[in-house]
Amino acid sequence: SRLKKEEINENKITLRVPSDIKKIYKLFKKNRKQLYIVGGAVRDAILGKSPKDFDLATDAKPDEVLKIAKQGGMKTYEVGKQFGVVVVGGHEIATFRKDIGKGRRPKAVDFSDIQGDVNRRDLTINSLFYDIEKNEVVDLTGGLQDLKNKIVKTVGVAKQRFDEDPLRKLRALRFQAVIGGKMDKDTEIALLKNPSLKGVSRERIREEFIKGIEKGKNSKLFMEALDKFGFTKQMFPQLKLQKPYPNVKSFILFLATILRKNDVKKLPSILNNLKYSNEEIRNITFLVHLKNFKPEKIYDFKKLQEKTTLKKQTIINYGKLIGKDFSKITNFNLSVTGGGPAFVGLKGKQIGDKIKELEKLNFLNESVINEVEPKFQSVHTTSSFEQTFGGWYSKYVPLSTKFMQKMIGKERV
């Protein structure tokens, strides 16, 4: 009928299917087996994004998938075969299935049809299948309309979906952030009634948090949603969270901003327990540590900065988020090497202390020069101190009004 034709047309989307997947599809079709692109790739295509990863689903059993792939001379990996998943040509192909048991790793799977496979998925917007030949979406849950209306809704009964796997609670909020949408009423009620993340690994919590910050449309709204449903205290135990939350795409900047009121000495161990990497911890703690900066500590701070992978602009941007100007600290370069007349007779710790003292003077002088440059263009006299130490003095101790007055008395700069 005309109505049916219009409904089918509404399901047509543009999805650029990679040539290797087209090859796999032809092999399956030749063997009279179904093969669909599923999940994230379909969702992203509808949102106008270019999918990076393609997952496939089929009615063929794992052994049949291996046999078909062998016919086409394609490389296969059987990792996950017991759960109905086989890798062919770098793409995961999962047999339609029902999961038996709770959690991310079900005890077993029961092979099913496409309807059964759809019913086991978490959200309607993630339950869309793409028919490669017809160039249209197969939608058995209303997910296409939910995606167009920017609504996050579970497949089936929300409580049941969340009880099966509590991680789905965070995924629901993450996808709400990604599409910039709102929560379905029943889904929201289920979250409010049972916000517990018990049984969810810290690694998965970290992963969902980072994706929500960096892939969501607004990190501030994402964090406020986590607050609303009672997740932040579970995700960041022992930590004080500073509000208002910022809207930034970098989770490093985000965490450094909201954690800046915490004891920087305790942060590394806490973040380590929350499964953040050593690199992430160094970057976050360095930024938080900047609140304790004093000129006499410039040497120590620059050494800490060297151990991070932070770009200069990232540090400057962090300063802007908390109302500070870190550009002078960031752009300052250590230059004292520990040689020259100033170090004659010094040993061990004395040398280190002298280096730090001179670097502090360098830093302070750069600051003064930046501030008074319009008034003071150059040095007009040569002091006896400068004559004595010559080039070393010019290289390691740039002139500042305060320093020179102390060292050479009445001579004018």
State where each predicted segment sits.
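Intrinsically disordered, compositionally biased, charge-dense segments
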Residues: 1-11, 357-413
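Catalytic cores of the polymerase beta-like nucleotidyltransferase superfamily
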Residues: 3-370
